[in-house]
A protein has these predicted regions:
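Aromatic- and carboxylate-lined catalytic core of secreted/periplasmic carbohydrate-active enzymes
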Residues: 4-8, 25, 358-361, 370-510, ...
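Short tyrosine-centred short linear motifs in exposed loops/low-complexity segments
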Residues: 11-14, 57-59, 63-81, 479-481, ...
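Extended acidic/polar, glycine-enriched regions
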Residues: 38, 47-113
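Extracellular beta-rich ligand/substrate-recognition surface
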Residues: 54, 473-478, 596-609, 658-665
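Active-site mouth of glycoside hydrolases
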Residues: 103, 108-331
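Catalytic-core region of carbohydrate-active enzymes that cleave or remodel glycosidic bonds
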Residues: 313-402
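Predominantly extracellular/luminal regions of secreted and cell-surface proteins
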Residues: 428-437, 553-593
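Aromatic, loop-rich ligand-recognition surfaces of beta-strand-rich domains
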Residues: 591-652, 666-708
């Protein structure tokens, strides 16, 4: 919405632009003049903001009212003789927000009164579930989409709609503001760049026609934008400090009135870049009249690191945007505990894990499929009230299998349209579902405190509420052992439930827990997989989904008599390959063509692939036979079923027991027998040892009873 500095009605938490026309011509309006405005509510509340040049003689001040009632404003221009920009006044009325998102109903995000987590303006707890989209303003496209079978023509909206459907609440990104990084993408994206004159004059058209459109879509859909302006020393080495200061002001002017949380830039905690990014952050703080939470994305560092200490001492710094990093090793409990106990600044600061073990990338080792899930659960039980997920192809916008964009072949082996479907993104949905259900803001991490448990191993973690009414634990050990919870209220009735991080469903443990001593000996885990546990005396948490746990039951190799081979519609983005000339092809047709000499071929064998089979109607599915390709390895796999693509049930899991492999005329076959009413069957074909592995499938035969 725009206002030509006249009386208009706007809604709280919604952006409106006050449009001004310069009365003077400037050689470079971006650099030659500055504009500010003060907005004053009828109750005396003031919000100070920067204005920005929007092309030609047009300048704007962007504002989102935070209270209903009458607001007035007055502008200040560095050129006081410019009567079109200086001393302009206006008044408007702000009405209630009629939208339906959490941001519409509860307001912008801020830090809680106890300094531990994020809340909306009205105090409603905000659960941070982020998705990593580094450099998206530059390189994610609004004018093309190469997801297999998609005709939307907008990669950004395709990604956004997917993440909204999965319950993500934060879009984590930064600008490649110097246009000096890009992972091989610079100069090849279809949209124009950020600069008309490199680092000297911004290109307002790019912001108006692309980036504002992106950020409007994010805000209007209820997404908080975790926003930085550049990347470590890459940006600061490429850009003069005065140019960085100017663009920091410009970006703050355009986007401070959005639902943002500032992360300054990626990895600022290094000698070459620290001072420059601190200056940038100070400019942001001075021009953000909303005082959005402000932090800075870090390297993987302990709290006593000299740069972390310096960061902690800055007036503008309010929360820690942690990076656990990547690779097979786990960040120890004590590192998170040190941030939890940190009082260097004299106040408590929240921290959130914003980069840890992106799914299916290689960095310090190959992360694989499960690492993201484990990192997320551990972080949440260790004081991070939320988590930012990242996945191959999406985190750095690798657009296609052709070319070298987004570090393809270096950090990522697959493009965005393969990464977006990874199983980890669904498991983030289940993570958030659990912590919202248990009232995450009431939980306190207990680390290795013997007063609350004997869970001292790095693979066993627990949090509990202050009143001892709720315990949440997580076990990612590879055996079935658990432990003892302590500090329960003696004589109080508790319920105990396992929670499956792979399905988002609970399984009752048994009878009510009543402890005379305040201790509860947790039963062995249902399986050797990772499991969460909820023990609570609360009865007001609401309804929950349950499941019968798949424990790796013994299988039969015999398909039931009367079962008929089906012809499902099959989709798999992990085998959709674009050639250098842009032509796409997929080998999914080979999966159910009845010909074992044709093979389905994944693009990156080291990564996981999801093969989705749609029967078009609910049927009693009886089993599946998978014929491996010639000389193919057998990776770990999991089979799941659903009647409607939500609420998946695990049907088979080779990580819990070995698959039964039979020879049949020179081909190796796996047969899994199960029974249930399903429309969709999902085969998660997990990672092979390396990308030279042959991980092909010659044929899939899915069996079901024919509906009468």
């Amino acid at each position: 919405m725009t206002m030509d500095h006249c009386t208009e009605n706007v809604q709280i938490w919604k952006r409106t632009d006050i449009v001004l026309t310069s009365g003077r011509e400037y050689t470079n309006p971006y650099a030659d003049v500055t504009l500010d405005a003060v907005f004053t509510h009828e109750d005396g509340t003031t919000i100070r903001l920067y204005g920005f040049w929007n092309g030609g003689n047009e300048f704007r001040v962007r504002f989102a009212p935070t209270k209903t009632g009458t607001w007035s404003y007055e502008t200040v221009c560095s050129d006081s003789e410019n009567t079109g920009l200086h001393g302009q006044k206006g008044k408007f009325f702000a009405a209630e927000n009629t939208g339906s998102t959490e941001l519409d109903r509860h307001g912008f995000v801020k830090i809680s009164d106890n300094g531990r987590f994020f809340v909306h303006e009205d105090g409603t707890p905000f659960y941070w579930l982020g998705d990593t989209n580094w450099q998206a303003p530059n390189y994610v496209s609004l004018t093309r989409c190469n997801y297999p079978g998609c005709t939307c023509g907008n990669q950004f909206l395709h990604e956004l709609n997917d993440r909204l459907a999965k319950g993500f609440t934060v879009y984590q990104t930064y600008f490649d503001i110097a246009e000096s990084d890009g992972g091989g993408q610079r100069g090849i994206t279809p949209e124009p760049g950020l600069w008309k004159i490199r680092h000297r004059q911004i290109n307002p058209q790019t912001f108006t026609e692309k980036i504002d459109v992106m950020f409007d879509a994010l805000a209007d859909s209820g997404m908080v934008i975790a926003l930085g302006y550049g990347v470590h020393s890459n940006t600061t080495a490429a850009m003069d400090i005065e140019d960085l200061k100017r663009v920091s002001r410009y970006l703050t002017a355009r986007y401070a009135s959005y639902p943002v949380v500032w992360i300054t830039a990626q990895e600022i905690t290094g000698e070459a870049q620290f001072a420059a990014w601190n200056v940038s952050a100070e400019i942001t703080a001075a021009g953000d009249g909303y005082h959005h939470p402000q932090g800075a994305h870090q390297f993987p560092l302990p709290v006593d690191n000299e740069y972390v200490a310096a960061l902690d001492g800055k007036d503008w710094h309010e929360f820690f945007a942690l990076q656990a990093g990547h690779g097979p090793s786990r960040i120890p409990k004590c590192l998170y505990e040190s941030y939890w106990n940190n009082r260097r600044s004299g106040r408590v600061k929240p921290f959130v894990e914003t980069e840890a073990n992106y799914e299916d990338i290689t960095c310090g080792g190959f992360n694989g499929y499960a690492a993201s899930r484990i990192a997320a659960w551990r972080a949440n039980l260790l004081g991070s009230y939320g988590f930012t997920y990242g996945v191959t192809g999406v985190w750095a916008n690798c657009y296609s299998t052709a070319g070298d964009t987004g570090w393809l072949g270096a950090y990522s082996f697959e493009p965005w349209y393969m990464g977006i479907d990874k199983p980890g993104s669904y498991e983030m949905t289940y993570l958030a579902k659990f912590f919202r259900y248990v009232d995450f803001s009431t939980l306190i991490p207990r680390f290795n405190d013997p007063a609350y448990s004997d869970l001292t191993e790095e693979t066993k973690l627990v949090s509990s509420s202050e009143d001892a009414g709720t315990y949440a634990a997580y076990f990612c050990n590879r055996d079935r052992s658990s432990g003892i919870l302590k500090g329960l209220v003696p004589g109080k009735e508790y319920s105990a439930k396992w929670y499956n991080p792979l399905t988002g469903k609970f399984a009752e443990i048994g009878n009510t827990v009543i402890s005379a001593t305040g201790q509860y000996t947790v039963p062995d885990k249902p399986t050797s997989a990772d499991w969460a546990l909820l023990v609570t005396c609360r009865t007001d948490l609401g309804a929950y989904e349950t499941e019968t746990i798949f424990c790796g039951e013994t299988i039969s190799a015999e398909i039931p008599a009367g079962a008929v081979v089906q012809k499902p519609e099959i989709t798999c983005s992990g085998s959709h390959i674009h050639t250098a000339d842009g032509v796409g092809y997929n080998t999914t047709d080979a999966l159910c063509d009845g010909d074992r000499t044709t093979e389905w071929i994944p693009f990156a064998p080291m990564a996981s692939q999801t093969i989705l089979m749609d029967l078009k109607q609910v049927k009693n599915v009886c089993g599946i036979r998978i014929t491996l390709g010639k000389n193919a390895v057998l990776p770990p796999y999991r089979l799941e079923g659903s009647s409607g693509q939500s609420g998946w049930t695990i049907l088979a899991d080779s990580t819990l027991r070995e698959a039964s492999v039979m020879e049949n005329n020179g081909f190796r076959e796996i047969t899994e027998i199960f029974s249930g009413e399903y429309r969709y069957i999902k085969l998660l074909w997990l990672g092979a040892e390396n990308n030279t592995s042959v991980k092909t499938i010659a044929e899939i035969a899915l069996y079901a009873e024919e509906n009468v």
